[in-house]
């Protein structure tokens, strides 16, 4: 059976995400430094990475962010991701299931993640404009523990065949009220501003995934698919993950914030947690590792990251995630002049 246009696009996305992956490329996390205090008065043995994230208890403040699904190749990737997440004890999100709503024959390319991770925390994923019936189908497909609704206006604008109507807020509110699992509203690499956070909170959303600029760039990916490749000027459009974190500081206590976008190594995770993230996600870095290494090697990498993170906690004098909120730790954050100016521009 010939591959559908949407399934082909999923394969293109994976290939282009890898083509444009630059793991050590500078991003906004480099504009955040941590004041070193030579007497942290901690021990690595005392560090506990376990934390409460919304209604869940996680073994560490890490998760594997949404990537792919919808074709034979991406189904194989999802099976591997399921195994890796299970072995590491990490929550994981699938890529957009929209293609499987239109073509149920590709649903197994998503369900395989649950098949290989029967007891893990798995998030489904749909565009924010989908109706309740589609959301329920997406959840059932994965026996999902939550549903991500992605906001991807910039991607759609650049995508040759993308949507052109972005009236989503009422639908998001309706889905939050109707669904029996938590709804996580996420960006796909262009960040979430404070005004957007306020709109979503008023609509009933209690889980945000900031999905900031700095990692996988869907402007680059979709522009490559355009005949004239004529929208490259949007390459730097959007808010970085760091800017998004600054924008949602001093938020309501019952709003859980996940941060992803440009996470390259454990130090970026530490910085995101210090800036207020409840948990931190990785996509491009994991995909790159998966495409070039065995499952066991990726598992070893992620396990080592968790071990390194414990040492970084001790380095800054922290033994639990909730201690990052203390003024003692917040005083260690050193922002670049550019970030200081941005923070001062944020209005409540």
Curated annotation (Swiss-Prot):
UniProt-recorded Gene Ontology molecular function terms: FMN binding; isopentenyl-diphosphate delta-isomerase activity; magnesium ion binding; NADPH binding; oxidoreductase activity
Main localization, broad class: cytoplasm
User: Which SUPFAM superfamilies does the UniProt record give?
Assistant: FMN-linked oxidoreductases (SSF51395)
State its location(s): Cytoplasm
Q: Which Pfam families match?
A: FMN_dh
Residues recorded as binding substrate, renumbered to this chain, are 9-10, 155
- Chain sites annotated for binding FMN: 66-68, 96, 125, 186, 216, 262-264, 283-284
List cellular component terms (GO). cytoplasm
EC numbers for this chain: 5.3.3.2
Binding positions (Mg(2+)): 156
Could you tell me which InterPro entries the record lists for this protein? Answer: Aldolase_TIM, FMN-dep_DH, IPdP_isomerase
- What keywords tag this UniProt record? Cytoplasm, Flavoprotein, FMN, Isomerase, Isoprene biosynthesis, Magnesium, Metal-binding, NADP
Q: What CDD domains does this protein's entry cite?
A: IDI-2_FMN
Role: Involved in the biosynthesis of isoprenoids. Catalyzes the 1,3-allylic rearrangement of the homoallylic substrate isopentenyl (IPP) to its allylic isomer, dimethylallyl diphosphate (DMAPP).
Q: How does it assemble?
A: Homooctamer. Dimer of tetramers.
Similarity annotation: Belongs to the IPP isomerase type 2 family.
What's the name of the protein? Isopentenyl-diphosphate delta-isomerase
Q: Which organism is it from?
A: Lactiplantibacillus plantarum (strain ATCC BAA-793 / NCIMB 8826 / WCFS1)
Gene that this sequence comes from: fni
């Amino acid at each position: 059976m010939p591959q559908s246009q949407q399934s082909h696009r999923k394969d293109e996305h994976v290939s282009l995400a890898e083509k444009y992956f630059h793991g050590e490329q500078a991003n906004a996390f480099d504009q955040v430094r941590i004041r070193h205090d030579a007497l942290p008065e901690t021990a690595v043995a005392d560090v506990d990475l376990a934390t409460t994230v919304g209604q869940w208890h996680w073994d560490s403040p890490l998760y594997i962010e949404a990537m792919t699904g919808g074709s034979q190749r991406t189904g194989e990737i999802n099976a591997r991701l399921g195994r890796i997440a299970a072995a590491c004890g990490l929550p994981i999100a699938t890529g957009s299931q929209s293609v499987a709503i239109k073509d149920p024959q590709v649903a197994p390319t998503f369900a395989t993640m649950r098949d290989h991770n029967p007891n893990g925390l798995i998030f489904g994923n749909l565009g924010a404009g989908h109706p309740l019936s589609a959301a329920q189908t997406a959840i059932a497909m994965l026996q999902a523990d939550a549903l991500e609704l992605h906001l991807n206006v910039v991607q759609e604008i650049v995508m040759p065949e993308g949507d052109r109507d972005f009236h989503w807020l009422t639908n998001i509110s309706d889905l939050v009220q109707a669904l029996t699992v938590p709804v996580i509203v996420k960006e796909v690499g262009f960040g979430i501003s404070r005004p957007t956070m306020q709109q979503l909170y008023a609509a009933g959303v209690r889980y945000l995934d900031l999905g900031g600029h700095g990692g996988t760039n869907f402007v680059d990916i979709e522009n490559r698919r355009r005949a004239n490749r004529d929208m490259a000027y949007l390459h730097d459009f959007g808010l970085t993950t760091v800017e998004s974190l600054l924008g949602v500081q001093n938020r309501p206590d019952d709003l859980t914030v996940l941060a992803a976008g440009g996470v390259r190594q454990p130090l970026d995770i530490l910085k995101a947690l210090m800036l207020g993230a409840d948990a931190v996600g990785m996509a491009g870095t994991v995909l790159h590792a998966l495409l070039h290494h065995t499952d066991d090697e990726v598992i070893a990498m992620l396990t080592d990251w968790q071990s390194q993170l414990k040492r970084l906690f001790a380095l800054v004098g922290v033994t639990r995630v909730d201690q990052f909120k203390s003024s003692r730790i917040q005083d260690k954050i050193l922002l670049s002049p550019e970030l200081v100016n941005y923070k001062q521009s944020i209005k409540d």
